[in-house]
């Protein structure tokens, strides 16, 4: 893994910082594990914008990732690491002993030729997946399930991890990167180690066009709009003279948005404020 700072041969190259990984596969992805990935432009079925700042971008194919890791007792070997345009983490193509191939999230340190396994009998090493009741307290894990058999939901992006801090009966307590402490059923699975490609956070796109290649459109300030477009719009000066709100008039800057009260009982400690 190398961090490459481009020379300022043009204004668009001046600030570019790339993350180069020579271990990534340079050919085409494994075709049977690809699916069509249609772009929405941030619109719903009525044609209305439901998510702002989305549109354009390069065509992409979705890689079917195995978040469940449920082929117990069958060893697999890592064939190669690949780039995935749909996520910040890299992915690994693994070949199981029964001949099946699957994509998984590439754990930190995982490389071609490594052996991995899933199930209660799997060894305690990075890339292996076990129920959390079988993982030692203090271990760092990723791709963590929140319901048994549902597939990993927590800690899936580049460099992400969760730490197991306690085990109490049918639940384990996890410390998330946000500082939140949360109880999860001990039968839920997790993959040992951190997600790889942690250097992803160091990259600098360098120009607006690089964001457009990724399907990200500009973010316009509310104060730069007209009153018809945003509550902050209009006026002669730059001061909008009211509490900051979203384009729909909902208070922003610190307003709580969590509505899933049903699972509040599993949160031991709220996330720490920045």
Curated annotation (Swiss-Prot):
HAMAP family: Ribosomal_uL2_B (MF_01320_B). The gene is rplB. Residues 39-49 have a biased composition (Polar residues). This is Large ribosomal subunit protein uL2. One of its GO terms (cellular component) is large ribosomal subunit. It comes from Edwardsiella ictaluri (strain 93-146). Residues 28-54, 221-274 are annotated as: Disordered. NCBIfam families: rplB_bact (TIGR01171). GO terms for biological process: cytoplasmic translation. Pfam families: Ribosomal_L2 (PF00181), Ribosomal_L2_C (PF03947). One of the primary rRNA binding proteins. Required for association of the 30S and 50S subunits to form the 70S ribosome, for tRNA binding and peptide bond formation. It has been suggested to have peptidyltransferase activity; this is somewhat controversial. Makes several contacts with the 16S rRNA in the 70S ribosome. The keyword Repeat does not apply. GO terms for molecular function: rRNA binding; structural constituent of ribosome; transferase activity. The keyword Transmembrane helix does not apply. Transmembrane segments: none annotated. Part of the 50S ribosomal subunit. Forms a bridge to the 30S subunit in the 70S ribosome. Belongs to the universal ribosomal protein uL2 family. Keywords: Ribonucleoprotein, Ribosomal protein, RNA-binding, rRNA-binding.
């Amino acid at each position: 893994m190398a961090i490459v700072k481009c020379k300022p041969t043009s204004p668009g190259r001046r600030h570019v910082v790339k993350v180069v990984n020579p271990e990534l596969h340079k050919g085409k992805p494994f075709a049977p594990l690809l699916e069509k990935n249609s772009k929405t432009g941030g619109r719903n079925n009525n044609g209305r914008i439901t998510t702002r700042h989305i549109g354009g971008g390069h065509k992409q194919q979705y890689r079917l990732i195995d978040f469940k890791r449920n082929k117990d007792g069958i060893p697999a070997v890592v064939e190669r690491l690949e780039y995935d345009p749909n996520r910040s983490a890299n992915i690994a193509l693994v070949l199981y002993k029964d001949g099946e191939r699957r994509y998984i999230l590439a754990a930190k340190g995982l490389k071609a030729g490594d052996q991995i396994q899933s199930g209660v009998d799997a060894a305690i090493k990075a890339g292996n997946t076990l129920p959390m009741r079988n993982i030692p307290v203090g271990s760092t894990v990723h791709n963590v399930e929140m319901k048994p058999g549902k597939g990993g939901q927590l800690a899936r992006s580049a460099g992400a991890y969760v730490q197991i801090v306690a085990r109490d009966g049918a639940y384990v307590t996890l410390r998330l990167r946000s500082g939140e402490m949360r109880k999860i059923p001990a039968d839920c699975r997790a993959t040992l180690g951190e997600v790889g490609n942690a250097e992803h956070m160091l990259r600098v796109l360098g120009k607006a066009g690089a964001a457009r290649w990724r399907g990200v459109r500009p973010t316009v300030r509310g104060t730069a709009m007209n009153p018809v477009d945003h509550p902050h719009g209009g006026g002669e000066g730059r001061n909008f003279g009211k509490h900051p709100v979203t384009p729909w008039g909902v208070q922003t800057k610190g307003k709580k948005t969590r509505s899933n009260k049903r699972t509040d009982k599993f949160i031991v400690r709220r996330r720490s404020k920045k």
